[in-house]
């Protein structure tokens, strides 16, 4: 009986379009007729419902474990060829969808941004979702990666991505609110802020738009709307190159997505 089934599975395998399966997130394993499914996990965000369904599918169709990828993704290995359609259907019930592989736009990575992190200057996850809606799965000559990080701490290593987006604070001093305490000068790590005759002086050539001055100010004497620093052409595969930031500070989402396009 077991031998007969494996024979049927081999016949099925001969008719499979592996390129299409890979495009849909199912990667062939070294074990015959086994696949590892890469899920689309935007910005590393999964709900309890997602996690429950992933666990159920891994137990039912895999070998009971999942792999967390280097780009915040989840892979379910040891899925049999015959179960692929059922796996997709059951994952969809839990709000999960397959990712993509090959030469196309991959899942967007992101930190938690200013919704959770005290250092965050932007809502990283919101930007990641919008990027995913615009570009996910788009066919390109080579795999393409977006990364969104909320501030200069750069937890997501923005410059490692083909397009990296880093949250910034477009800081402006508000003299009327300032008490001349000098806290912002001490908070500034780049030496962009100095106190001169009890007043703040900012050298914007030194400013990296981290926003520490605004966050440290006890009297809210800084205006610090969200902004973006974008980098291009970062690669960290077989060849390594740091993404470059040729554009000035981007001050709104419309400009940001125009730059991404």
Predicted regions and their residues:
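Intrinsically disordered, low-complexity polar/charged tails and linkers
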Residues: 4-34, 49
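Small-residue-enriched alpha-helical segments and adjacent helix-cap loops
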Residues: 9-13, 37-171, 175-179, 187
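Short beta-strand elements
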Residues: 25-28, 163-167, 228-237
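Short, flexible, solvent-exposed loop/turn segments with mixed acidic/basic and small polar residues
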Residues: 26-31, 62-68, 236-237
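Short, solvent-exposed beta-strand edge segments and adjacent coil->beta transition regions
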Residues: 34-36, 71-73, 197-199, 244-245
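Beta-rich nucleic-acid/ligand-interaction surfaces
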Residues: 152-154, 204-208
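Iron-sulfur cluster-binding cysteine motifs and their immediate structural context
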Residues: 183-201, 208, 212-228
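A hydrophobic, small-residue-rich beta->alpha segment in the mid-to-C-terminal subdomain
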Residues: 227-229, 234-261
């Amino acid at each position: 009986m077991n031998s007969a089934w494996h024979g049927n599975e081999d016949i099925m395998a001969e008719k499979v379009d592996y390129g299409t399966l890979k495009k849909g997130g199912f990667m062939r394993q070294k074990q015959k007729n086994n696949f590892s499914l890469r899920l689309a996990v935007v910005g590393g965000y999964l709900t309890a419902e997602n996690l429950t369904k992933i666990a159920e599918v891994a137990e039912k169709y895999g070998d009971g474990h999942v792999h967390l990828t280097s780009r915040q993704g989840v892979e379910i290995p040891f899925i049999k060829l015959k179960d692929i359609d059922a796996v997709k259907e059951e994952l969809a019930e839990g709000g999960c969808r397959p990712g993509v592989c090959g030469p196309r736009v991959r899942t967007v990575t992101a930190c938690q941004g200013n919704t959770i992190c005290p250092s965050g200057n932007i809502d990283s996850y919101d930007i990641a979702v919008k990027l995913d809606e615009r570009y996910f799965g788009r066919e390109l000559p080579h795999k393409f990666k977006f990364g969104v990080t909320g501030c200069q701490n750069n937890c997501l290593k923005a410059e490692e991505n083909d397009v990296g987006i880093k949250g910034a604070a477009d800081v402006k001093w508000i003299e009327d609110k300032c008490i001349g305490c000098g806290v912002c000068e001490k908070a500034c790590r780049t030496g962009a802020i100095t106190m001169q005759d009890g007043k703040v002086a900012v050298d914007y050539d030194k400013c990296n738009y981290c926003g520490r001055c605004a966050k440290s100010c006890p009297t809210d004497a800084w205006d610090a709307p969200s902004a973006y620093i974008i980098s291009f052409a970062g690669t960290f595969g077989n060849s390594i190159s740091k993404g470059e930031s040729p554009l000035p500070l981007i001050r709104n989402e419309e400009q940001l997505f125009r730059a991404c396009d």
